[in-house]
Amino acid sequence: DLYGKSKYLGEVCDQPHVITLRTSGIGHELRSSNGLLEWFLSQQGKVRGYAKAIYSGLPSVELGRVINRFVLPFPKLHGLYHVSGTPITKLDLLTLIAEVYGKQIVIEPDDTVVLDRSLNSKRFTEATGYAAAEWPVLIELMNGHRY
């Protein structure tokens, strides 16, 4: 698809001393509410939670930790690596965020959107030893690093 092709075209993956991390981030924004987290936290009443849309990114605070502890210490690491968490539906992700953040909102399950852009981090894990924590832990971490 166009999304995948555009990502591929922007990735440098065949040069020594160059690493490309393919990932997706979720987290707090400084001046906008364009991302999923800030959008969700700004909503009132009810929202739809996509039961068949799969997400496997990581909180931005965790991505920073990954780079600091699992990329920088490996100067010979090069090429393209996927860095991700355990795949989770957007419905389950929003439900966990609501629980951890104490957000009072109704999340209506919606199965009309079917999308799986999950990543497989096996190669990165084998190269670095990194394995993402479970989603409740990651969301607690994200909540603890509000700006």
Language-model segment annotations:
Residues 49-54, 80-88, 127:
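Glycine-rich Rossmann NAD(P)(H)-binding loop
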Residues 60, 90, 131-135:
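Amphipathic alpha-helical segment in the mid-to-C-terminal domain
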